[in-house]
Amino acid sequence: MIYKIINFILSKKDHEEKKDLLLKIMKFFNKTPLNFLIKNKFPNNNISCMGLNFKNILGLAAGLDKNGDYIKLFSDIGFGFIELGTVTLKPQHGEKKPRLFCFPNVYGIINRMGFNNNGIENLIENIKNEKNVKSILGINIGKNKDTLIEKAKDDYLICINKAYYYSDYISINISSPNTKDLRKLQFGELFSDLLKSIKEEQNKLNKIYNKYVPILIKISPDINNSEIIQISDCLLSYNIDGVIATNTTVNKDIIMRCCNNCEKGGLSGAPLNENSTRIIKKLSKELKGKIPIIGSGGIISVKSAKEKIKAGASLIQIYSGLVFFGLKIIKKLIKSF
């Protein structure tokens, strides 16, 4: 109810401004005696995946809490895991506003945020300052806009080094459509070299901290079956711990079919569901259960969530579903598994 009231009050705001204000207001309420309006308590399902113990199957996808400003809030409202970021080595402003567009008639969102964030150091400080967080914390990392694609590996390795001790898992974002050439890192020598270097860094940090932090790769939905096979082979070859499927789509057919006023950027939400589920199904076939899949992209109902699990996902994440349906979707999804 409180989500609906605040959402209505802010209905005339720019979508990004509305989102930010909504989160700030909810964070404030969560620190008052009225926090019972926000907090959710669910029985722990104790799902084991990647050597981690998740209290439930549902996670928050990267993008909603880029800087770790709302960790306690998202933990208290029930998420089993929270993926922070995408964060980059250096702070950056991202693309010019407006850059976030909602299409409620199809439950779709187009964004061209461009990895706006306050940098990895700021995120780590925010994590250090949090207390009594009962959700698994993931950190999603990307490269800075001004880092050449040939040098992108260095950004990822430095960020892994900084994030390792403070995260339960790390995800590597090489699939956002809003950073030039980023998706090239999913293929060929750039991909294999990145994975090799990541595993070497992970092994080194494991010895230093005596702590194994799983590393996952987040992939694009705009890939064909041949590319899925190539990506899967590489993930298996380098013993990558997990894969997140998928990021947003730039498939013009899907976008034009759903959003007549076509904005530049990546499309998420319900229009992405069918394609992301297709990717998960094919990935699952190729990975043969050796690498877990986190299903993300278009989950706006129990039905779409169960489709992801049936296709082969071990865990699921939402973003657009939360934007359109508020806290009630968290309850529905968690109670359904």
Curated annotation (Swiss-Prot):
InterPro entries: Aldolase_TIM (IPR013785), DHO_dehydrogenase (IPR050074), Dihydroorotate_DH_1_2 (IPR012135), Dihydroorotate_DH_2 (IPR005719), Dihydroorotate_DH_cat (IPR005720), Dihydroorotate_DH_CS (IPR001295)
Protein's UniProt keywords contain Oxidoreductase: yes
Annotated catalytic residues: 176
Pathway(s) per entry: Pyrimidine metabolism; UMP biosynthesis via de novo pathway; orotate from (S)-dihydroorotate (quinone route): step 1/1
Major enzyme class: oxidoreductase
GO cellular component: cytoplasm; plasma membrane
Annotated compartments: Cell membrane
One BP annotation, GO: 'de novo' UMP biosynthetic process
Domain of life assignment: Bacteria
The protein's Enzyme Commission number: 1.3.5.2
GO terms, molecular function: dihydroorotate dehydrogenase (quinone) activity
Key words, A-Z: Cell membrane, Flavoprotein, FMN, Membrane, Oxidoreductase, Pyrimidine biosynthesis
PROSITE patterns for this protein: DHODEHASE_2
Binding site for substrate: 66, 111-115, 173, 178, 247-248
Catalytic activity, reaction form: (S)-dihydroorotate + a quinone = orotate + a quinol
Cofactor list: FMN
Annotated FMN binding sites: 62-66, 86, 140, 173, 218, 246, 269, 298, 319-320
Annotated cofactor note: Binds 1 FMN per subunit.
Membrane topology summary: Peripheral membrane protein
Pfam families documented for this protein: DHO_dh
Family affiliation: Belongs to the dihydroorotate dehydrogenase family. Type 2 subfamily.
Summary of the function given for this chain in its UniProt record: Catalyzes the conversion of dihydroorotate to orotate with quinone as electron acceptor.
Complexes and interactors: Monomer.
Protein name: Dihydroorotate dehydrogenase (quinone)
Source species: Wigglesworthia glossinidia brevipalpis
Gene name of the record: pyrD
